[in-house]
Design a protein with these regions (language model features):
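Nucleic-acid endo/exonuclease domains
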Residues: 1-176
Length: 176
């Protein structure tokens, strides 16, 4: 195989968000609660919409499930940011066909934003985890294979055999 192991990949994913305390909290709770090695995830998934030169980073993406999670910190409560989020979500949908779910880590009290209590936030995270599990089960029942074969994902041969690469399939390969 190429550059690094699945273990290194997983821990580097968390390292990418170590400076964002709420994002780190929510994402690590989601992943540890899921405890499912067959569900691929990516922190800070890079997404380029087809109609502009900007790019977006999805906080937590589940490519095989067609799903991503945005963790809304305080700035997402501002009117301008809410409008930007709507545009962003529409462009990500167009680029990936992925469903977006959001978890806000703050409450708005008048003009003030305060952090949610961990117990309330944990309940929302647990609901999201149940949603992810249900989505996986639904896809499997419809005949979709959900398996995170880390080594295969990064081998170009996997895509050469298919003789086709689709932009929305989250293709990745290591340079050997």
């Amino acid at each position: 195989m190429g550059a690094f192991s699945k273990e290194t990949y997983v821990t580097r994913n968390f390292q990418k968000i170590s400076g964002k305390r709420w994002e780190l909290y929510v994402i690590t709770r989601v992943i540890h609660s899921l405890n499912d090695p067959d569900i691929e995830y990516v922190c800070q998934q890079y997404i380029i919409p087809p109609k502009n030169n900007e790019y977006y980073l999805a906080d937590l993406a589940f490519p095989s499930l067609g799903l991503y999670l945005e963790i809304d910190e305080g700035q997402h409560g501002d009117k301008d940011h809410k409008i930007a989020d709507i545009k962003r979500d529409a462009e990500i949908l167009e680029a990936t066909d992925w469903e977006c779910k959001r978890i806000a880590v703050f409450l708005k009290k008048g003009n003030t934003k305060i952090d949610k209590k961990l117990s309330e936030l944990n309940n929302e995270i647990d609901e999201f985890v149940q949603y992810v599990r249900h989505k996986k089960e639904t896809l499997i029942r419809s005949g979709v294979k959900i398996e995170w074969d880390y080594e295969k994902k990064f081998h170009p041969e996997s895509y050469i055999e298919k003789e086709k690469i689709e932009r929305v399939k989250n293709v990745t390969a290591n340079k050997n």
